[in-house]
Amino acid sequence: MKKMLVCGAGGFIGGHLVTSLKQQGHYVIGADIKQHEYKKTDADEFYQYDLREQSNVRKLITSDIDTIYQLAADMGGAGYIFTGNNDADIMHNSAMINLNIAEEMVKKGVRNVFYTSSACMYPSHNQEDPDNPLLSEESAYPANPDSEYGWEKLFSERLYMSFARNHGLRARIARLHNVFGPQGSWNNGKEKAPAALCRKVAQSTGEIEVWGPGVQTRSFLYIDECIEGIHRIQASDCGFPLNLGSERMISINGLVELISTIAKKSVKINNVPGPLGVMGRNSHNQLIHDTIGWAPQDNLEYGLEQTYAWISNMIEHNIADAKTA
């Protein structure tokens, strides 16, 4: 039995990863600034620590840990990342967490780290055409992310790779593309497009507002495929970043239509000004396929069915709780 540490275990992906690692038979320690909002953690130990504080990281990382999965970050959807109001917090908070973890790994002799980067680190000039975005791994430079969130992710990629070169860390890095599924943020201002649109459709009486023209495109990776990819990349010999996302691209208006079909509702789309991000983003999976012999499957419909059902249930419970309060 190996001892695993999941930083960010109180978050959406981290919570699912803890469960998966336990199912594999590992002893799992979870850490986060908050408890998971929607489930009781499956971790053997959970520490509610602010990982920006070096003293907390010093207590958390011990020499008997086999692998650290570093998912902890200051993050959110377009309404959080692209307004500009949170740029300093995003840069400072996430950078401090990664600097603390990398330094303490060296001090304690812990070698293995898995870092979740993001497709947000890709240059904005390669994502202006909604029909033909360029997001192959080698297109990352010259660097020009469209947000401070993306710049920090790029910095931390280089941080872990430099610690691998100079201090012997075994770093594995995945650039995640719009991961979605149950048990994630859906109504707190940090939710991403699939969850936000599932909520809007579920609450709709005929019309919903969608930020931007709706022709902007994205690909979306269901959480089960994300967790599978994390395990496969971590077990591989690949020491450079790999895309982890779906190659199926869909417009935001198209995503609304797909969710509406799943919900069996007729919904009119009202496109309004709002935080937008790039016009086109889609995973390019040739390198991950060539490197580890695997790439995510297209589970968009299935994933949206599961996510919509979960969010609808959450809405119903919130209404019921409000009536009995």
Predicted regions and their residues:
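Conserved Rossmann-fold NAD(P)-dependent oxidoreductase catalytic core, especially the SDR/UDP-sugar
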Residues: 99-146, 172
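NAD(P)H-binding glycine-rich loop region in Rossmannoid oxidoreductase-like domains
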Residues: 51-93, 124
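Active-site helix of classical SDR
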Residues: 148, 152
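NAD(P)-dependent short-chain dehydrogenase/reductase
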Residues: 125-134, 158-234, 247-249, 257-262
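N-terminal Rossmann NAD(P)H-binding glycine-rich loop of SDR-like oxidoreductase domains
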Residues: 4-24
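Conserved glycine-rich Rossmann-like NAD(P)H-binding loop of the short-chain dehydrogenase/reductase
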Residues: 26-35
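Rossmann-fold cofactor-recognition segment
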Residues: 42-54
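C-terminal substrate-binding subdomain of Rossmann-fold SDR/epimerase-dehydratase oxidoreductases
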Residues: 20, 203-325
